[in-house]
Curated annotation (Swiss-Prot):
Predominant subcellular localization, coarse grouping: membrane
Protein function: Part of the outer membrane protein assembly complex, which is involved in assembly and insertion of beta-barrel proteins into the outer membrane. Constitutes, with BamD, the core component of the assembly machinery.
Quaternary assembly: Part of the Bam complex, which is composed of the outer membrane protein BamA, and four lipoproteins BamB, BamC, BamD and BamE.
Origin superkingdom: Bacteria
Lineage summary: Bacteria, Pseudomonadati, Pseudomonadota, Gammaproteobacteria, Enterobacterales
Signal peptide: 1-20
InterPro entries (UniProt xref): Bac_surfAg_D15, BamA/TamA_POTRA, D15-like, OM_assembly_BamA, POTRA
Protein name per the record: Outer membrane protein assembly factor BamA
C-alpha cells in the first residue's frame, strides 16, 4: 500500500501538501467513518468528482463544503495514490432532550427555543450551538434579576453515535432592589416619582402592582414612565442622563441610580397645522385647539395626534401620518407645536373576511357589520362591527386587521379574526339536599345553535318540591332589519311548603312570544303576549295570601288547609334594553340596563302589573382591564289593578347566588303569618294570638338589591385561560318588602315584624369564582352575612350552573 499523505488535519488548522500547479487526477473517492450520512449525500456536497484534477485549493474547498453540511465534527482528506480518502467523524445524533431545575421557564418554551436553533431529537448535535444556548438562557435569567443563575448542557454518549442532552438549571434567587435613587430632581420628591414605578425598593402589603424583584424590562418601562411624568407637566427639556444598576457582592441585592436633568417648565404658544389635510382642515384644526398659555404636555400631544388619525380613518384614510415637531423657545420658555399631516390615499373596502369562525356561519357574523363592501373605509364602522361581534357572546376574542390589496393603491380587505368559545351547555345531575331531597336536573342551552345564531334551550328539573320543564327558542334576526322573535312554553309543578316557602302547591303551564325591535346600535324595545294557567291547592291560611284572595272575591276558609282555586291570565309583556357592554360574556367595560314588565289584559282572572329593572356597570381600573369595578342593581315592583292585589305567587324574592349571596335562596323578606295560632306545625310559638309568625318566606311586591364587586386577576391561571375564569370580591345588599302590609295591633301582639318597612336591608361579603367550563358557566361563591334578621337562613357556600355577570 502506498504511503498515505496527510492533506488537511482539522477545521482550525489547515496544512496541506503542495502538489504543484497541475495537482493530480482523482481516480476514486473513498469515505471512512460514515454512519448516518449516506455516501451519495456526502459526494453531492463535495466540489470534487472522479476524474477531476485537484490541487491544494480544491482540497480546502472540499473540507469547507463537508463542514458546511453540519453533519461532521472533524474532516480529514488523505491521498492514497490516485484515490482520495476522506476520513470523517460524524456529529452524534440527539436521542432525547430533558430539562432539570427550570421553574421560571416552562419545558414547552425551552423546546421551542431549541428547535428554533436547530436542536431537536433526531438531529445532529452542534456543540457550538449549545454554548450559545447556554449563554442566551443565562442572559435571560440576568434580565429578570437572577444573577446567580447558571445553565449547563450535559451530553451523555450512547451506543451508535447517539447522545442524551440534558439542560441543568440552577436558577438561584431574584435579586431584590435595595434602593432606588433619583439624582437631579427638584420639582418632585424621590418618593413621589418612585410611586409611579412598578419596581420599588419598598412595597407595602396592599400594593399588588409594586415589585422589589429586579427586571430589566420593568426598569425600561419605569424610565419611560418617569420621562412621561415630566413631559406631561411642562418639562420639555427633561432628560435622563444616565442609569446605573449596581449589584451587591452576593448578587442578591440591586442598587439603581437614575441621573436626570429636569430643566424648566414650558408653556404652549400655539399650534400650526400643515400638510395634506384631505379637505378636512376645519375638523382637524378643531382637534388642535390647545389653549395658549397652558403647560406643555406630551400626553395631550399624543391624544391630539391620535384624534387626527381617528378622524381621517373615519373618512377612509387608513394609513395617515401625523408628526408633531415641538419648536422650543428657551428665551420665553414656550413651545410652539408644528403638526404635519399627510392623509395619504383614501381606500375602498374590497372584501370583508372572517377567520376562526369554525362553527358560526359567515352570515351570522356578516349581519353584524356596519362597514359595507365596496364603500369607503370607515374605521369607526369597522370598530362598530368588532363591538357588535363581541356583544354577541359567541367569541372569546375579536380582532380586526386592515390589509392592503396587492397591486391596488386604493383598496383594502377588512379581516375579523375571532376565537370561538363554547356557547352551549349540557348538564345532567343527580344530587341530594336537605330541602330538595333527591334531585335530578337535565338541561341543554345553546346560544348559537348550529352556528345559526339561534338561541335554543331545553331544561328540566325534578326533586321533592318541583317538577319543571321548559323549551325556548329565539331568532335574533327574524327579519333582515334585526327584529328578533322569541318564544317559550313551560310546565311547573311546585310545592312551596317543601321548598321552605309559604304553604301551597301550584301547577302551572303557559307560553309566551316576544318581538324585539332595535331602535339604534344600543337600544332595543320588546313587546309580546303571554298566557299562563295557575292551579293552586293545599293553601294553608296565611295573612298575605288571604288578603289577595279577598281582593279578587275568592272565598276561602281560615280553618282549612285544603283551599284552592285556578286562574287563567293573559299578559302584555314589554321591555327595553340598553347595552353598551364591551363583550357578551365577562364584560370589562360599559353598562347594561334591562327593563321588563307585564300587565294583564282583559279576559284575565287577575288584574296586576309587574316591573323589574336590572342594571350593571363595569369600570376598568387599569389599561389592561384586568382590574374592574362592577356595580349591579335589581329593582322590582308590582301591584294589583282595580282594587285587586298582586298574586302572591308573583311576588319578588331575594337571597341566593344571583341576588344576595350568603343567604339561602329566596329567604330574604317577609315571612308567612298563619291563621290558627299555635296549632300550626310551622309556627313560631311565641304568643297566644290567633295568628303566628313563621320562617316560611312569602316574598313581597317590592324588591331592591345592590352589589359592588372588585374583579381581579385570577391567581395561578395562565394567560391562555384568563378569558375563561373570573375572580371577584363582592359586597351584596338587598331587601324585599310588602307595601300593602298592615302592621296592626294583632300583628304586633304576635311578634310579627313590620313587613312594609323597606329599611330591613340584609348585607353580606365574600369571594366568587366564575368559570366558562366545557359544560357551561359554573359559578362558585363563599359569602358571610354580616347583617341579617330573625328568620333569615345563611348559606355561605353556593354553586350555580348557567349564569354569569
Amino acid at each position: 500500500m502506498a504511503m498515505k499523505k496527510l492533506l488537511i488535519a482539522s477545521l482550525l488548522f489547515s496544512s496541506a501538501t503542495v502538489y504543484g500547479a497541475e495537482g493530480f487526477v482523482v481516480k476514486d473517492i473513498h469515505f471512512e467513518g460514515l454512519q448516518r450520512v449516506a455516501v451519495g449525500a456526502a459526494l453531492l456536497s463535495m466540489p470534487v468528482r472522479q476524474g477531476d484534477t485537484v490541487n491544494d485549493e480544491d482540497i480546502s474547498n472540499t473540507i469547507r463544503a463537508l463542514f458546511a453540511t453540519g453533519n461532521f465534527e472533524d474532516v480529514r482528506v488523505l491521498r492514497d495514490g490516485d484515490t482520495l480518502l476522506v476520513q470523517v467523524k460524524e456529529r452524534p445524533t440527539i436521542a432525547s432532550i430533558t430539562f432539570s431545575g427550570n421553574k421560571s421557564v416552562k419545558d414547552d418554551m425551552l423546546k421551542q427555543n431549541l428547535e428554533a436553533s436547530g436542536v431537536r431529537v433526531g438531529e445532529s448535535l452542534d456543540r457550538t450551538t449549545l454554548s450559545d444556548i447556554e449563554k442566551g438562557l443565562e442572559d435571560f435569567y440576568y434580565s429578570v434579576g437572577k444573577y446567580s443563575a447558571s445553565v449547563k448542557a450535559v451530553v451523555t454518549p450512547l451506543p451508535r453515535n447517539r447522545v442524551d442532552l440534558k439542560l441543568v438549571f440552577q436558577e438561584g434567587v431574584s435579586a431584590k432592589i435595595q434602593q432606588i435613587n433619583i439624582v437631579g430632581n427638584h420639582a418632585f420628591t424621590t418618593d413621589e416619582l418612585i410611586s409611579t414605578f412598578q419596581l420599588r425598593d419598598e412595597v407595602p402589603w396592599w400594593n399588588v402592582v409594586g415589585d422589589r424583584k429586579y427586571q430589566k424590562q420593568k426598569l425600561a418601562g419605569d424610565l419611560e414612565t418617569l420621562r412621561s411624568y415630566y413631559l406631561d407637566r411642562g418639562y420639555a427639556r427633561f432628560n435622563i442622563d444616565s442609569t446605573q444598576v449596581s449589584l451587591t457582592p452576593d448578587k442578591k441585592g440591586i442598587y439603581i441610580t437614575v441621573n436626570i436633568t429636569e430643566g424648566d417648565q414650558y408653556k404652549l404658544s400655539g399650534v400650526e397645522v400643515s400638510g395634506n389635510l384631505a379637505g378636512h382642515s376645519a375638523e382637524i384644526e378643531s382637534l388642535t385647539k390647545l389653549q395658549p398659555g397652558e403647560l406643555y404636555s406630551g400626553a395631550k400631544v399624543t391624544k391630539m395626534e391620535d384624534g387626527i388619525k381617528k378622524l381621517l380613518g373615519r373618512y377612509g384614510y387608513a394609513y395617515p401620518r401625523v408628526q408633531t415637531q415641538p419648536e422650543i423657545n428657551d428665551t420665553d420658555k414656550t413651545v410652539k407645536l408644528r403638526v404635519n399631516v399627510d392623509a395619504g390615499n383614501r381606500f375602498y373596502v374590497r372584501k370583508i373576511r372572517f377567520e376562526g369562525n369554525d362553527t358560526s356561519k359567515d352570515s351570522v357574523l356578516r349581519r353584524e357589520m356596519r362597514q359595507m363592501e365596496g364603500a369607503w373605509l370607515g374605521s369607526d364602522l369597522v370598530d362598530q362591527g368588532k363591538e357588535r361581534l363581541n356583544r354577541l357572546g359567541y367569541f372569546e376574542t375579536v380582532d380586526t386587521d386592515t390589509q392592503r390589496v396587492a397591486g391596488s393603491p386604493d383598496q383594502v380587505d377588512v379581516v375579523y379574526k375571532v376565537k370561538e368559545r363554547n356557547t352551549g351547555s349540557f348538564n345532567f345531575g343527580v344530587g341530594y339536599g336537605t330541602e330538595s331531597g333527591v334531585s335530578f336536573q337535565v338541561g341543554v342551552q345553546q346560544d348559537n345553535w348550529l352556528g345559526t345564531g339561534y338561541s335554543v334551550g331545553i331544561n328540566g328539573t325534578k326533586n321533592d318540591y318541583q317538577t319543571y320543564s321548559e323549551f325556548s327558542v329565539t331568532n335574533p334576526y327574524f327579519t333582515v332589519d334585526g327584529v328578533s322573535l322569541g318564544g317559550r312554553i313551560f310546565y311547573n309543578d311546585f310545592k312551596a311548603d317543601d321548598a321552605d316557602l309559604s304553604s301551597y302547591t301550584n301547577k302551572s303551564y303557559g307560553l309566551d312570544g316576544t318581538l324585539g325591535f332595535p331602535i339604534n346600535e344600543y337600544n332595543t324595545l320588546r313587546a309580546g303576549l303571554g298566557y299562563v294557567h295557575n292551579d293552586l291547592s293545599n293553601m294553608q291560611p296565611q295573612v298575605a295570601m288571604w288578603r289577595y284572595l279577598d281582593s279578587i272575591g275568592q272565598a276561602a276558609s281560615k280553618s282549612s288547609d285544603n283551599n284552592g282555586f285556578a286562574a287563567d291570565d293573559f299578559t302584555f309583556n314589554y321591555g327595553w334594553t340598553y347595552n353598551r357592554l364591551d363583550r357578551g360574556f365577562f364584560p370589562t367595560e360599559g353598562s347594561r340596563v334591562n327593563l321588563n314588565g307585564k300587565v294583564t289584559v282583559p279576559g284575565s282572572d287577575n288584574e296586576f302589573y309587574k316591573l323589574t329593572l336590572d342594571t350593571a356597570s363595569y369600570f376598568p381600573i387599569d389599561d389592561d382591564h384586568k382590574w374592574v369595578v362592577l356595580g349591579r342593581t335589581r329593582w322590582g315592583y308590582g301591584d294589583g289593578l282595580g282594587g285587586k292585589e298582586l298574586p302572591f305567587y308573583e311576588n319578588f324574592y331575594a337571597g341566593g347566588s344571583s341576588t344576595v349571596r350568603g343567604f339561602q335562596s329566596n329567604n330574604i323578606g317577609p315571612k308567612a303569618v298563619y291563621y290558627g295560632g299555635n296549632d300550626k306545625d310551622n309556627c313560631n310559638k311565641t304568643s297566644s294570638s290567633e295568628v303566628c309568625s313563621s320562617d316560611d318566606a312569602v316574598g313581597g311586591n317590592a324588591m331592591g338589591v345592590a352589589s359592588l364587586e372588585i374583579i381581579t386577576p385570577t391567581p395561578f391561571i395562565s394567560d391562555k385561560y384568563a378569558n375563561s375564569v373570573r375572580t371577584s370580591f363582592f359586597w351584596d345588599a338587598g331587601t324585599v318588602w310588602d307595601t300593602n302590609w298592615e302592621n296592626t295591633a294583632q300583628m304586633k301582639a304576635a311578634g310579627v315584624p313590620d313587613y312594609s318597612d323597606p329599611s330591613n336591608i340584609r348585607m353580606s361579603a365574600g369571594i366568587a369564582l366564575q368559570w366558562m367550563s366545557p359544560l357551561g358557566p359554573l359559578v362558585f361563591s363563599y359569602a358571610q352575612p354580616f347583617k341579617k334578621y330573625d328568620g333569615d337562613k345563611a348559606e355561605q357556600f353556593q354553586f350555580n350552573i348557567g349564569k354569569t355577570w
